[in-house]
Amino acid sequence: MLANYTRSAKALSALLQREGVEDTQVLDAIAQIPRHIFVGDVLQHKAYQNTALPIGQGQTISQPYIVARMTELLQLAGVRDKVLEIGTGSGYQTAILAKIFTKVYSVERIKALQWQAKRRLHQLDLYNVAMKHGDGWQGWESQAPFNGIIVTAAAAKIPQDLLAQLADGGVLLAPIGEQEQKLTMVIRNGNNYTEHVIAPVRFVPLVAGDIE
């Protein structure tokens, strides 16, 4: 299967389309990105299943449907260019974003994961991504504002620093809650922030600080 990952990735894209993902750019990105390089060798046989998988350090690579749906929501909201990702993790979501948006900034608190993700993105010739090892709660102030912000770990509430770094008219997507999490879209209009609950989800927690 892995020797012919293109067929497997296309099959995954077709599955996500049947599950309700409609954006053709997102589906094309899923079909083009080899998900198996973002997981360990022992789990590569599961790489093209629609399921989350462990990647070490207590973290996971998100379910492909969630990756596709969150990316699609940014597209539908009109985000086109500058996107901040909080929680690089394996780099799979980063790669999908890089296929669609002009410039992607990604922050990862665990340095080992950040370096692994950077190597994978270079392997795929994705050079429109800037990566940083740091505390995701703080965002990336020096590169703000961002038209879109996507948070790939759950917080009890959205960190204020991230809201402040959202451009006027920009869109933030994040899983909110502790025991019961809900994917939430926040749209900024001047100093007003409007929240829309999208769906129940399950993510690892967004932890403050960073790890060397």
UniProtKB/Swiss-Prot annotation:
It is an enzyme of class 2 (transferase). GO terms for molecular function: protein-L-isoaspartate (D-aspartate) O-methyltransferase activity. It is found in: Cytoplasm. Keywords: Cytoplasm, Methyltransferase, S-adenosyl-L-methionine, Transferase. PROSITE patterns: PCMT. One of its GO terms (biological process) is methylation. Belongs to the methyltransferase superfamily. L-isoaspartyl/D-aspartyl protein methyltransferase family. This is Protein-L-isoaspartate O-methyltransferase. It comes from Pseudoalteromonas translucida (strain TAC 125). The gene is pcm.
